[in-house]
């Protein structure tokens, strides 16, 4: 099944988007992300414009009810058959009533549509990683790995 690279979901109704349609939302989200994390990553953090270009080039991007922007990619794990959808970023961009559990359901659905064996969400951009792990666990996600940075 073909799944467009850029997609908008409003109340479950999918609408394919062009790069030109999704780009302003992605650029604004990357500016917010950059401002939050520039102190932590310093010179290693891509500029907002660079990050937007990478995402627009490399990721599937879904805008859910104008509330959440999720970028994901297909990833293979060296130790497992098949592939998973891996969340590259999950950003709240609106103030509507979309629940985080709905975002997880969307990703599970996309995993099925892509033929993936599941999906993965990370905590790399969270300011409080322990809190985000607890939040994800409350929504039924299970921790499967720990990644340490040196």
Where are these regions (language model features)?
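Conserved catalytic-core motifs of GNAT/GCN5-like acyltransferases
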Residues: 122, 142-150
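Acyl-donor binding region in acyl/amide transferases
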Residues: 82-137
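A conserved beta-turn-beta hairpin within the catalytic core of GNAT-like acetyltransferases
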Residues: 76-87, 142-143
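Conserved beta-strand in the GNAT
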Residues: 63-75
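Well-ordered, non-membrane alpha-helical segments in soluble/globular domains
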Residues: 45-51, 101-106
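A short helix-loop-beta-strand connector motif used in the catalytic cores of GNAT acetyltransferases and
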Residues: 50-64
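Short secondary-structure junctions
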Residues: 6, 137-144
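Short amphipathic alpha-helix that is part of the acyltransferase structural core
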Residues: 1-45
């Amino acid at each position: 099944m073909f799944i467009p690279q850029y997609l908008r979901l409003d109340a479950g109704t999918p609408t394919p988007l062009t790069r030109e349609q999704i780009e302003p939302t992605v650029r604004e989200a990357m500016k917010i992300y950059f401002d939050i994390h520039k102190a932590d990553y310093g010179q290693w953090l891509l500029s907002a414009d660079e990050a937007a270009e990478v995402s627009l080039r490399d990721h599937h991007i879904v805008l859910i009810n104008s509330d959440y922007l999720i970028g994901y990619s297909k990833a293979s794990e060296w130790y497992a058959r098949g592939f998973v959808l891996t969340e590259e970023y999950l950003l709240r961009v609106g103030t509507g009533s979309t629940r985080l559990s709905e975002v997880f359901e969307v990703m599970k659905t996309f995993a099925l549509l892509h033929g993936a064996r599941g999906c993965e969400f990370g905590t790399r951009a969270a300011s409080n990683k322990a809190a985000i792990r607890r939040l994800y666990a409350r929504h039924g996600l299970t921790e499967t790995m720990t990644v340490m940075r040196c």
